[in-house]
């Protein structure tokens, strides 16, 4: 009688190990052949496929290809000519599963690192209401009070959703984070290892005197081709509205001044040397570029 439970436990362990190995093999095969598989799938299926691969990697303790060398932060900072404490700016690209950290060097920001996002939830498009499990898109500012060193998901910072633009459109939700781990119901999960480095950089910037850092969240790389291929979709106009702010930063390396006018994002070029600390304002100006 006492041997039966032991045999069942051993059987379940063998089954679990086999399942883990098969999952790992399938994940390795899928990733190795992703260039052949992905072009034939609808975009939302491609996104689900990407999530599955990344969650599989994380569950097996593997490092996703393209992850920065997290053991060489000091050397990477030295090579870039910057230090912990430099003002920071964050950009997120959902479709590419990438989070970028930009650090201020002189009067401009320069891209320091690109981190693969482990998981975000929902589809491409903005968060609209509480419980829709959407990860937001738009322009946000993050201050010291938004940082949580004791997060359920290791460490986190609150994006500040809903911002003035979201509130103008009566979008609802709360506690939308960038955090560790690899689970999401509306947040951006980065794994604990990556979040440790991201945390060090953003906290260092805030401790060093930056009041807030700008976080720009885009559905995908806002190239003309990417926008044209999605023109006429439900979110096409909203995505087009993000491009002026995206392009101002690309062109100048200075965070744009962001405001909301008539429920629409509006952008002005940031002053030379600005660090992106300015909060989102609700105001209209003759100088602002107004697009939805």
Residue ranges and their predicted role:
Residues 2-185, 193-292:
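N-terminal pre-domains immediately preceding structured catalytic cores
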């Amino acid at each position: 009688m006492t041997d039966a439970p032991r045999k069942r436990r051993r059987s379940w362990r063998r089954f679990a190990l086999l399942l883990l190995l098969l999952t790992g093999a399938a994940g390795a095969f899928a990733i190795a052949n992703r260039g052949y598989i992905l072009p034939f799938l609808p975009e939302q299926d491609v996104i689900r496929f990407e999530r599955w691969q990344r969650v599989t990697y994380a569950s097996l303790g593997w490092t996703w290809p393209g992850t920065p060398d997290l053991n060489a932060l000091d050397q990477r900072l030295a090579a870039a000519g910057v230090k912990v404490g430099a003002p920071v700016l964050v950009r997120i690209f959902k479709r590419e599963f990438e989070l970028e950290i930009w650090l201020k060097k002189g009067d401009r920001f320069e891209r320091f690192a690109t981190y693969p996002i482990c998981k975000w939830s929902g589809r491409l498009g903005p968060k609209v209401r509480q419980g829709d499990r959407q990860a937001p898109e738009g322009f946000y500012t993050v201050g010291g009070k938004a940082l949580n060193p004791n997060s359920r998901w290791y460490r986190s910072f609150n994006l500040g959703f809903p911002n003035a633009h979201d509130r103008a459109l009566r979008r609802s939700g709360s506690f939308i984070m960038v955090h560790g781990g690899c689970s999401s119901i509306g947040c951006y999960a980065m794994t604990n290892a990556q979040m440790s480095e991201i945390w060090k950089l953003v906290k260092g910037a805030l401790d060093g005197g930056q009041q807030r850092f700008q976080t720009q969240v885009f559905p995908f790389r806002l190239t003309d081709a990417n926008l044209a291929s999605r023109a006429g979709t439900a979110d096409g106009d909203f995505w087009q509205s993000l491009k002026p702010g995206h392009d101002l930063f690309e062109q100048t390396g200075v965070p744009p001044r962001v405001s909301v006018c008539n429920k629409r994002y509006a952008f002005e070029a940031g002053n030379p040397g600005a660090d992106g600390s300015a909060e989102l304002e609700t105001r209209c100006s003759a100088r602002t570029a107004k697009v939805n």
